[in-house]
Amino acid sequence: MAKSIKKKKSPPTEEQQLKRQKASFKRKIRNMFTGAGFTYIATNDKEMYIGHRKVEVDALFIFENIWLVCEDTVQKTGIMDHIRTKNEAVGEIRDNLPDFISKLVELFPGSSDLLQKYNPDRIKLFGLYIPLNDPMLTPDDYYRFGNLTFVLPQTFNYFKWIVDCIKHSARNEIFRFLKLTSNQIGKISSGSDTQKITAPIIYPREFTGITDKVRVVSFMMSAEDLLNTCFVLRKDNWEDSIWLYQRLIKKSKIKQIREFLEKKGEAFYNNIIVALPDDIAFRDQSKKYVGIDEINDLESNCELILTKEMNSICVIDGQHRIYAHYVSGVDSKQERRIAELRQQLHLLVTGLVFDKDVKAEERARIQSEIFDDINSNATKVPRTVLTQIKRIKNPIDDESIAQSVIEALNKEGIFRGLMQVSSLDSGRIKTASIVRFALRYLVTVKPAEGKHSLFEYWTGDKEKLLSIDDRELQNYVKYCSEILREYFGAVRKNMRKYWDDDTSKLLSVISLNGFIIALTRQLSVNGVQDFDFYDQVFSRWSFDFSSEKFPYTSSQYRKFSNEILENAFDIPKETLETI
């Protein structure tokens, strides 16, 4: 009998590919929120009339009184009309929330208890817009579409990672993103002592201090309380701040510690390091409140009183030991055992107590220094984390300024969204080598003898900048970014076919470093010029940036800069040797 010949499958059409992409993205969104403990209501394709318009919600996720009305899109073009429509729809839902609830109960009678658990005035409803691709919104766009909270790709990938690692315990991260406090979630609390955490102080003599304005106090705290009140300043999260220095949590490390806890049932003896919130209090054995300066006697049996507020205790070291106690949401043997240990095990915690007048940036510097000291001889810290710590400790260090310039370039202009500024980013351009081997020399405030940098040409207040004035630092970063946009704007104009070609070498690290080094070296000849000057320079230069013909390999940055200086800037060879 002849074998039947299998018919070759034809490749999926563009429409089929788009359909699969949409389904995959929706599945990821659903898994992320349900993985964090939210309940999914399948509102997709359910049209309803709310207020004065017809609305359709892609997905609804509920935890207690927190409702997340989610809109997603895989569109790359024409996205502004979609955002406007969804912004108006969320506004209509908020204005007519009782009608929205009634309609949902009608559509989903099996979920009526969940949908009617809270009065409408207690429900906190958020309109989340989750795009697969960054829509590149301006500040004006964010203001105009104020009914929506945008979960951009980096933020979504961050939440997806955290939920995958610590399951339901990642919910507090989402609440922090939404700027929610504990008293806004669930039923209204009475505000009694049940909302306080009492922790016995172990070493009151230890608060001799790191600086005059920082004290240190050690105490015992249950894993559950710590898990429910802590947060971590991870550099890959959604916050637009330079004061973030912690690395991403590691799933393998969490798993290893969790298995140890399940097997041994013991806490780790090395202490957790945290920064405590400002509203802590101290109480002696007679329950009288005392100041921190009065608790220097071990015999007084003092207690530390903390408000039971999520995201209030900043973890400096020990995030894996804390989060290994996560709530999985799965009724497994391991979860039942860990649930017992969360309440039973008390971890040794050393907390920094800052004077209330210590600014956020100074607190971050102290915290990052401690993190650096602790981890310098432990697990190898990624270079991006070390750069971030250096940036916090010394914001005017050349690499610190260079990193700030990279982030500024990534926010607007020709490089917007192209830079990989986070380990979760899908940006086309990796930046660590650009900062380290090229950009730092262009922006340094202390160029080597005989060398030049943009600092020389900047007309801002140099003395203030050198004294680490934050406003002047931002002004200098803005200046450097604008110069680079003009320079590379001319490059893009004259080499557009290579700029738009993902396979070309124009936007490779080798090429970009060569261009930046060339710009730095030519300062001694031309100084700082404008777009028209650079446009003229590159209009008369022709170079093949195709991946097949590009002749330079890794680390040949200076050699490529010679090509640019000699053949684009027309700088003689004998001059090249001196700059």
Mark where each language-model region is.
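Interdomain/boundary linker segments immediately adjacent to catalytic/signaling cores
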Residues: 1-28
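Accessory terminal alpha-helical modules
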Residues: 3-6, 10, 47, 51-57, ...
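Terminal low-complexity regulatory extensions
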Residues: 22, 38, 94-95
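Short Pro/Gly-enriched beta-strand edge/turn motifs at strand-loop
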Residues: 35-45
